[in-house]
Amino acid sequence: MFAEYKTLEEVKKQIVFKKIVSWDKDKLILDDGTVITIEFSEQDCCAWAGGTFKDVKLDAVITDVQIQDKGQCIYNGDGHDSYADVVIYHNQNEIAKAECEANDGNGGYYYSVCALRVKDIQCVITEA
């Protein structure tokens, strides 16, 4: 993995106290124009990673962001999958979720990284 990844705390500094004003399954757009995406940031050979946003509520102020681990390196019969959700909150209420997954490719010999991207900052969500 490359050293360019930042912590979730650094991502929060870019988005907390802003509002989600538009969204689709691939991105959230905040009131200041900031775009939040889920990126397939690294991989080798046939490994892959990704995620999509769902259940987004507009115009609520972001007060927190959490990454919830849903299982790491779970054997799938040919390699391993890792799962995590990115959950965005207004107070204690969920206002957006991205379900994310990473796969380590054919036979588990490779790797992939799924990252949350805000501006030029990337934060690892999950990896396999």
At which residue positions do the language-model features occur?
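Surface-exposed, interaction-prone regions used to assemble/regulate multi-protein complexes
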Residues: 1-128
